[in-house]
Amino acid sequence: MPKGSQTSLTSNLMLAWGYANGDIDFTMHFSGPLLPEIDRGLGITVVAGVHVGCFELFAKEDIRGVADLKGRTVGTLGLGTGPHIFISVMASLVGLDPAKDIVWVTSEKVEPVELFAEGKIDAFLGFPPEPQRLRAQKIGHVIVNSALDRPWSQYFCCMLAGNREFVRKNPVATKRVVRAMLRATDLCVSEPALVAQRVVDRGFTPRHDYAVQTLAEVPYNRWRDYDPEDTIRFYALRLREVGMVKSNPAKIVADTVDWRFLNEVRRELGG
């Protein structure tokens, strides 16, 4: 890709394609869904945890917890996507078999949030600005808030990962990317109004108020405190339990992470 350019990929399949073709050097991606791709041999190195708590599990009012999803319809763009993987892990922790006990409704043409708002599905995993919209419209309620509820609040949801060969061959550039990402994360804490306006100006959301709410609700201040390796181990174990990865957590950690750049940036930025 040209220097300084960016692209948006909406699925794990496109992510894998982008890495394989050399179109992507770095991605900020949901932690859990990275691991099945790594387990299948995708050359990714995870270099930092970025933030915690960007997803919320919305459900109809009669569903009071994850266990109540048994036999209910749950929307996702596709099997193997981030929401499908996260909800599968949640379900397995309360004794459900996500492959058998949940009725997955997949749609590439209609967003799950729209199906939920129309009452066509019972639950879905929302990401900003979807939760902010649903709260404003008083649609459904949250049964899992990853910013507040354990164990999800104890682990990163989004992590910075790089093309393995790029990271190996370009340590100086990799460190610059890590530093830039974490300084931007700090800016979300120190200058939320400025960041919210830039999010709107760049077309990521038309609603300034939703952007402000997101910056207030998502914990962007945890990257100094949390050990990102804990996140990799947690999701590797959980995904192995539901059959989405074959490797054990120790092997995934050994093959996948490089915290040198994060540790250097922590010392430079304080933390």
PLM ranges: what are they?
Residues 240-271:
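Conserved C-terminal helix/tail region of periplasmic/extracytoplasmic solute-binding proteins
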Residues 120-122, 218-232, 263-271:
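Short amphipathic alpha-helical segments at helix boundaries and their inter-helical linkers
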Residues 32, 111-202:
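Pocket-lining segment of extracytoplasmic ligand-binding domains
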Residues 168-247:
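Secondary-structure end/capping motifs
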Residues 1-108, 115-118, 122-128, 139, ...:
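Short, glycine-/small- and polar/acidic-enriched structural segments
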Residues 38, 92, 135, 200-201, ...:
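Short polybasic/polar patches that bind polyanions
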Residues 79, 151-154, 206, 227:
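A generic short alpha-helical patch detector that favors 3-5-residue windows
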